[in-house]
């Protein structure tokens, strides 16, 4: 009986690991979530994947509401990778805030090799993260997106 449980678990483990290899190109390089505030903050989610696809979901106070997709150029993709490579994952904080009560929350998820870093951005953000944020907004404006039906 124990042997059959072991075989089932081993089969599940191997099937999951083979699926992981097949989807490596769809893994996310960077995701950026812009949350709401008391004012008119833009609310959206942007993901840039290793297969160079961009997923955009506009939720509130943005020009494009709904889910969209496009492809990023090799140059822009390399620029994002370069900016991420400048971030010291071991020494960067996970939360940047201040004493202000109505701050616009942004969530930045960075992925590099086998490292992931989730950072909550409110205020007092270091320069290298501001550069990434600036590049994200540039990419949103730069590309034409295809609307995805729900």
Can you say where each PLM-predicted feature lies in the sequence?
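Short, well-ordered, aromatic-rich surface patches in folded extracellular/luminal domains
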Residues: 5, 16-38, 87-150
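A short, structured loop/turn motif at beta-sheet edges
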Residues: 48-52, 71-79, 110-116
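Residue-level detector of beta-strand structural context in well-folded domains
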Residues: 44-46, 68, 106
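Post-signal-peptide N-terminal segment of Sec-exported extracytoplasmic proteins
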Residues: 38-63
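A short-motif feature that recognizes glycine-rich, charge-decorated loops
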Residues: 57-90
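A short, polar/proline- and glycine-enriched secondary-structure boundary/capping micro-motif
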Residues: 42, 64-71, 129-132
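Sec-dependent signal peptide recognition
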Residues: 2-8
């Amino acid at each position: 009986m124990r042997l059959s449980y072991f075989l089932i678990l081993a089969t599940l483990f191997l099937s999951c690991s083979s699926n992981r290899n097949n989807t490596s190109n769809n893994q996310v390089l960077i995701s950026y979530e812009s949350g709401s505030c008391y004012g008119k903050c833009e609310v959206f989610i942007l993901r840039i994947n290793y297969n160079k696809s961009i997923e955009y979901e506009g939720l509130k106070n943005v020009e494009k509401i709904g889910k969209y997709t496009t492809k990023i150029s090799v140059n822009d993709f390399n620029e994002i990778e370069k900016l991420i490579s400048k971030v010291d994952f071991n020494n960067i904080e996970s939360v940047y805030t201040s004493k202000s009560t109505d701050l616009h929350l942004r969530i930045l998820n960075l992925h590099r090799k086998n490292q992931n870093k989730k950072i909550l951005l409110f205020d007092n953000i270091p320069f290298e993260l501001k550069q990434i944020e600036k590049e994200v907004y540039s990419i949103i404006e730069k590309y034409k997106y295809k609307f995805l039906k729900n």
